[in-house]
Curated annotation (Swiss-Prot):
Gene3D superfamilies: Galactose-binding domain-like (2.60.120.260), Glycosidases (3.20.20.80), Immunoglobulins (2.60.40.10). Its EC number is 3.2.1.165. It is an enzyme of class 3 (hydrolase). This is Exo-beta-D-glucosaminidase ARB_07888. It comes from Arthroderma benhamiae (strain ATCC MYA-4681 / CBS 112371). Residues 22-31 form a propeptide. GO terms for molecular function: exo-1,4-beta-D-glucosaminidase activity.
Amino acid sequence: MWFVFRPAAIPALLLTLGVSALSPLRPLVSTAGQHEVIPGWYLQSERHVSSSIFSLSFPGADVSSWYRMGPRGTVMAGLLENGVYNETHLFFSDNFKSLPDADFRDVSWLYREEFTLQPGSGQHFTLHTHGISSRGDIYLNGHRVASKDVQAGSYAGYQYDVTKHVLKGGNCLLIKAYPTNYLRDLALGFVDWNPYPPDNGTGIWRHVELSQSGPIRLSSPRVTTDFVPGVRVNDTNLTVKTDVHNIGQETIRGSIKGFIEGAQNQRQPISAPFTLKPGEQQTIEMNTTIQNPSVWWPASWGDQPLYTARISAFVGKIKSDGPKRRKFGIRHIESRVNDQDTVEFKVNGKPFFVMGAGYSSDIFLRFTVERITTIFQYVLDMGMNTVRLEGKQEHPELYDIADKMGIMIISGWECCDHWEGWKYNTEGFGQPWTDVDYPIANSSMLHEARMMQTHPSILAFLIGSDYWPNDQATNIYVDALRRMDWNAAIISSAAKRGFPKLLGPSGMKMDGPYDWVPPSYWFGDRLGAAGAGGFGSELGSGVGTPEIRSLKKFLSEEDMKDLWTKPNKVLYHMSAGVSQFRDRSIYNKALYARYGKPNSLDDYSLKAQLMDYEATRSEYEAYAAYKSHSNPTTGLIYWMLNPAWPNLHWALFDYYLKPMASYFGTKTGARIEHAIYDYREQAVYLINHSNSRSGARSVTVDLINIDGKSLSHSTMKADTTPLMSQKLSKVSGLDKNRDVSFLRLILKDDAGKVLSRNVYWLPQREDVLDWGNSTWYHTPVTEYADLTPLSKLRKADVRVDINIQGRTKTRVSLQNKSNHPAFFIRLNLLDKASGDEVTPVFWEDNYVTLWPHERIELGVTYPQTHRVELEVSGYNVEKKMV
């Protein structure tokens, strides 16, 4: 059975250190319908405040010695903003350990701001919270608006009618943020991903807003449609819903009026009357029909047209609230659990194979549109289509960007702490839930669902991660999602350990691995391997080693020496110290055995990039190859996309936004049309992730030894089918491999255009896996593949020509002048003035291997602020600058 799911400028106040000077400034809000962010905060530890909270909550108190920060930020983010701590210093080596926990863990912090208001007759003021971690007392002008027992939960958003507390002229808002405990509170933590921030994310991490209205207050609009591909195509019925609240003292008759605005200057009016008694709240619906709707598609499948719903509330001809705006897209999500107990998704009627990775927030929960835009550009550049947010829902801007770019989002709550404090959870550390947690969970789910509802990028919400919620919590979550007209999948967890009665099995598997496994693992038929079928909700080989220039930014000379001389040492920039992943012992054992003991940091770094490229490419390729099997793969989430701070694993690009070999392994493995090598079957698979491309294809298969001598040459031909994979033929000549051979697959269409170029380095014998002794994070290897003959490769002479095309593009020509391969050529774009690596940077390909006398051309784009030069190096290619 298929489950069908049917379906928004902040003014800056110029503030001096003397807060009382704010009074003459223009009002923060002054007209009905105006909605503004509290523009900034004065921050101080309660431990360093001599005055009472009560007195500090009145206008005019002197807080000139407090820290001044922006409109949202945790305590640590605010202290960094003020230069109390320096990020470069904090992140270097183990300096993070020196942060004084005593200043944070048991201490509340005060956020204070003054602003001007000019309240008038019949006007009402509402305070909106969206994320205070994890509890707060809220005061306005000496009145406690809410206690920590009400304002509780890092994701719980609330609205407070503060009309009776506002003053004409200066006003003061004071929020006391209580210290967060991940195991006790419904907060947002980092599990074992990295060291915990000393403040545990305490503070006003999302905006606080103030709105002005008449007696009728509106919620943001929600939008549902009856769009069904193949059923309703020429017209779509659309419903706009809003929650209308009479906060006045008498019965009011009024109307909601607005428009649906489309991309082609479409403007359709919508309206509905209402009658509300004092204090009453109703959900009002407005219906209209859109002719020939513009349908929203994931990035590689089509365009991302967006509509806008705009509504206002009127009492007679007087506006009481609005306009409230939300952008939305018209699309159709379906999900089901198939006969193999695997979840399958469809988007607009097409089978949607998830290729994604797990996102991490910044360690101090800092957020910028610029950074998330770059991260999402990298996601698309790698060929991925989905990002998983495990308890890291971030801010509305993230979903706006995903909508515009066509990236699907799987959101949900996090594992291992209080969110999963269930009696049957034998692996987590969270305290058990009590009666007070369920209302917080309800408020959290309502708020997040309201924020996400109109976003077409939402694919699913996971109400559990490693463990499913109990039936009481499940009912609360599902009721809240449905109350907010949820139009995407609701999934009980990311694993198959169990499920709540209401939702049934999740169809997702969480069988690992999380640490290194060889490329051949992914073509196996057990656990997390693709041959076992399924949807891998979080899995990977634990790779993501930054290149040396990045390592030097956060590791000392001794730290870097430890990397290659002490393979079993616990490393501070791995996972948290209590984690299984606190060292690189499993990874290094394989590196030493497969590629040889490193003789320098440079040697270690190069071999690590080889390991990482192999690891990510094989994972994405195996899952793609087996998506058309009888027990199909339906998607995977690589663990992880990006780090919360500078780290040594679980990433596809580093903290400084520099792509690594793991990035380009992914980019190769996730190509929309692709030819891949199955390590287990020694065969070629033809992959098609597009929803429309078809026709004749050819794969040229070449196998050579390390001296460049041909071992086999053949051409395989087949017709490709959209959204399908197919096995072609076995690779010939592998029996002639005496040490290490190179395999090149070149996929072309019927016009001879190259669609994919893919090079493997293959040992004489593959790694031997000990499946029977697998753990939740790793499958041991009893015999490692021998790739050490690569060290015998003769130096290759590679000619490099560059053609700079304007200020943001360059074409690079690489030609191997030698009679043997030029292996694993790295291209690094540097700023001419500083010598620093250019980021963000988008290469068509990188870490490439050239056949004897082969020539290829690669393009690169980058920000126009840089004058660039190119560094070229490789496994057997001398480093040079061009």
